[in-house]
C-alpha cells in the first residue's frame, strides 16, 4: 500500500492511529471502545477491526491487555500494523482473515472479550457504495450478523463477553442471535443524538454461558444544548485533547 495515502490521527496520551480514505472511524467506534473497556481484559478480539481504532483505544487505556485485530482487507491490516509499530501498541496483533478461515490463525475458546462494530445493513438493504471496501464495511457482503455472533461464541471462553454496537432497528435480531449462540444479553444502552430524539445506536454486552437477566443502562445523549454532553466529553477525553 502507498503510505502517502495514510495520515496519522491523534488519540491522546501520546498515541496516534493511521487512517485511510477507506478505513477511518466514527463516533460509534469510540463509544463501543468506551463501553467495552470497562471490563477486565486480558485477551480481546476485534472482528472487522478496520484501521484498528477500537483495539487501539482499549490498549491506550489498558496497555497490558492483548488485542487481536481481524479484518479481511489487506489495506486495513497494513494500516493497523503500521500504527502498532510506529506508535508503540506492542500488544496489538493484526490478522488478515475472513471468519471462515480464522480458526487456522487464532486460538478459539480462550478470549475474555470480542468486540465488533459490524456492517449495519443487510446484504441487499438500501443503497450500496461503488467502492467495494466501503461497501464491505457498511453492508453484510462478506459476512452476516449471524456469522459474526457464531464465530464470537467460539472465540470466547466461558463468561467471556461480546460487546457490539448496532442500529436500533436490528436490536431484536441481535439479541435473538446472541441467545441462540449461548451468549446471554446482559447489558443494553441506547444512544440518542440529544434528548427527545429517537435512538441512533444501541450498545450491547452479552456473556458466554451466563444466566438470564438484562440490565438496561440510562440513555447516552451525544449533545446537550448544541454541545457535547458531559458524558461525551468524558468519553472523548484524551482523544479530544489530542486535537486541541
Question: Where are the regions that the model predicts?
Answer:
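Conserved Class I SAM-dependent methyltransferase catalytic core
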Residues: 25, 142-193, 197-199
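Conserved beta-strand segments of alpha/beta enzyme cores
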Residues: 16, 66, 91-93, 184-187
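SAM/dcSAM-binding transferase cores
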Residues: 198-244
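SAM-dependent Rossmann-like transferase core, predominantly class I methyltransferases
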Residues: 2-43, 49-51, 56-61, 202, ...
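Mobile active-site "lid"/loop adjacent to the S-adenosyl-L-methionine
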Residues: 118-147
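Conserved beta-strand termini and adjacent loop/short-helix elements that scaffold enzyme active sites
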Residues: 20, 97, 188-191
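Conserved SAM/SAH cofactor-binding pocket of Class I
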Residues: 34-127, 150
Amino acid at each position: 500500500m502507498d503510505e502517502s495515502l495514510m495520515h496519522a490521527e491523534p488519540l491522546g496520551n501520546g498515541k496516534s492511529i493511521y487512517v485511510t480514505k477507506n478505513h477511518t472511524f466514527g463516533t460509534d467506534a469510540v463509544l463501543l471502545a468506551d463501553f467495552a473497556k470497562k471490563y477486565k481484559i486480558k485477551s480481546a478480539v476485534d472482528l472487522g477491526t478496520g484501521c484498528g481504532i477500537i483495539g487501539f483505544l482499549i490498549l491506550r487505556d489498558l496497555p497490558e491487555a492483548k488485542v487481536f485485530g481481524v479484518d479481511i482487507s489487506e489495506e486495513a491490516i497494513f494500516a493497523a500494523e503500521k500504527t502498532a509499530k510506529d506508535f508503540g501498541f506492542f500488544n496489538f496483533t493484526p490478522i488478515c482473515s475472513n471468519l471462515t478461515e480464522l480458526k487456522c490463525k487464532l486460538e478459539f475458546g480462550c478470549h475474555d472479550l470480542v468486540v465488533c462494530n459490524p456492517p449495519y445493513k443487510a446484504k441487499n438493504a438500501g443503497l450500496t457504495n461503488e467502492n467495494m471496501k466501503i461497501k464491505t464495511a457498511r453492508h453484510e457482503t462478506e459476512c452476516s450478523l449471524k456469522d459474526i455472533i457464531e464465530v464470537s461464541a467460539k472465540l470466547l471462553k466461558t463468561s467471556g463477553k461480546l460487546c457490539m454496537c448496532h442500529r436500533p432497528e436490528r436490536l431484536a435480531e441481535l439479541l435473538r442471535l446472541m441467545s441462540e449462540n449461548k451468549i446471554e444479553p446482559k447489558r443494553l444502552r441506547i444512544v440518542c443524538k440529544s434528548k427527545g430524539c429517537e435512538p441512533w445506536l444501541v450498545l450491547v454486552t452479552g456473556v458466554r454461558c451466563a444466566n438470564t437477566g438484562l440490565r438496561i443502562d440510562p440513555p447516552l445523549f451525544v449533545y446537550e444544548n448544541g454541545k457535547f454532553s458531559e458524558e461525551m466529553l468524558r468519553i472523548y477525553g484524551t482523544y479530544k485533547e489530542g486535537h486541541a
